Amino acid sequence: MKKIIYFFLINFIFLFDYVNSEEIKVSKKLYSIKNSNINFLHDVAIFNLDGSINVVVEIPAGSIEKWKLNSEGDAIELELKNNILRKIDYLGYPTNYGFIPKTLLPFEINGDGDAVDVLILGKQLIIGQIVRCNVLGMLEMNDQSLIDNKIICVEKESYFGKANSIADLKKLAPGIMEIIEIWFANYKGEKIEIIRTSKKKKTFKFIKDANKYYLENLDKKQ
């Protein structure tokens, strides 16, 4: 329990330690972040030649603001709820949070209609940053009966990059999976069902299936 409390305190200390990026443009009026060179959802490849995946950051570790990719995929926006900028009423995010480009969990399969969510372990990142990550596994979850799985990844160049599986991560950083599970089970103030953690083989199948749904959805729109 002491490790868990300490972890969250460290998150708050680094809450505003953001890194500048010339490619990222912020419009305070629209609470929107864009990259002038690419569409976050459609223009970024999923897989790299070394087996890592590309992840787009939506929410930096430690933040309480709820940023999310818009429906066009070209901007990450601070969500509105009842015309109020959305913030979570809980401790800040324990990891960086983002999505895998060119993926979709459609409503037909009981998905939420969004790209696949990712938790990125490593240093605090910035909104709109594209990061190469190694996949360790997946936290299987349901949010109000919808599939809400989270891919567990590590930033390749970080301390956590030494891990190659969930089992490795538990040895490298004892208590970290418990922290993540406790946080996601409670941050909304309503019951989220944590089902299980899955290994890499099942996780990659989940990602590839989500890419298939994304491509099928593109075909329907054309």
Protein language model features and the residues they cover:
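Classical Sec-dependent N-terminal signal peptides that target proteins to the secretory pathway
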Residues: M1-S21
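Hydrophobic N-terminal alpha-helices or hydrophobic patches in metabolic proteins across all domains
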Residues: E22-Q222
